[in-house]
Amino acid sequence: MERSFDALFSQASLFFLAAVRVFALMFTVPLLSVRSVSRVVRVALAGLIAFLVLPLAYPAPMQVREFSAYYVLLLLGEGLLGILTGFFISVIFTTFSAAGQFFSYQMGFGTSEMYDTFAQIENPLMGQFLNFVAMLVFLQIKGFQILFLGGVLRSFQAVNCFVFLRKQEALLLFFTKALSALFLHAMTIALPIMGALLLIHVSMGLLTKAAPQMNLLSEGLPLTIVVTFVLLSVILPYMINLFVSILFGGFEMFEQLLVKLGKAL
């Protein structure tokens, strides 16, 4: 243990580089970026992860002069890498919030919003519900272990901050594909409920046109709400597998980006 701490003090500059990237990731990744998680916990966790990945992230000793302009640029680049990684993880979870937004208005919850503590924005109620389910799935599949123990280490081994200056087109294409996949997955989640609600609205419109005295429009809002919750209770157990595939698909997409950027080193 003493040797480990001696090695840490001898490579303090590299340790701070690793800690800055992990610390920036902590402040942007869902679940850990919320205000309920204290900064002390995030700093301690970032330091622990940086200490664990340091021998594997920098197997060969590097001589970097502290407090030089080059070292400051390295710190800024590592912070940018952590922020972009956390932003991509946030994009994955935005898929589930967007899916809830697609059918919230149709079911009558268009104006019912609540504060999303994860994204720190106002989010429709159903989007918040699906996002919460996705968080539980993320914890169930050991997403934190995959992200912080595997993903962080692979990012250190594959990418440094100067790669972004040489691979801007690859990054732009990657985030474009990620946003396209976000919309596609959100539509896949919301489409069954949107289709059922569309049939209900069309049926009520035809019945109201055929028999105006029935006044079905006054009963339409409770009916759509009840049908939506019944459909969610039926299809949600089957959608868990889709949630898992979306999360793992996002991790695989990010790993492919690291491999592609690693070739530029």
Curated annotation (Swiss-Prot):
Pfam short name (any one): Bac_export_1
CC terms in the record's Gene Ontology section: bacterial-type flagellum basal body; plasma membrane
Organism: Treponema pallidum (strain Nichols)
Segments passing through the bilayer: 14-34, 44-64, 73-93, 132-152, 182-202, 229-249
Function: Role in flagellar biosynthesis.
Keyword Lipid biosynthesis: no
The name this protein goes by in its record: Flagellar biosynthetic protein FliR
Entry keyword set: Bacterial flagellum, Cell membrane, Membrane, Transmembrane, Transmembrane helix
Major location (coarse): membrane
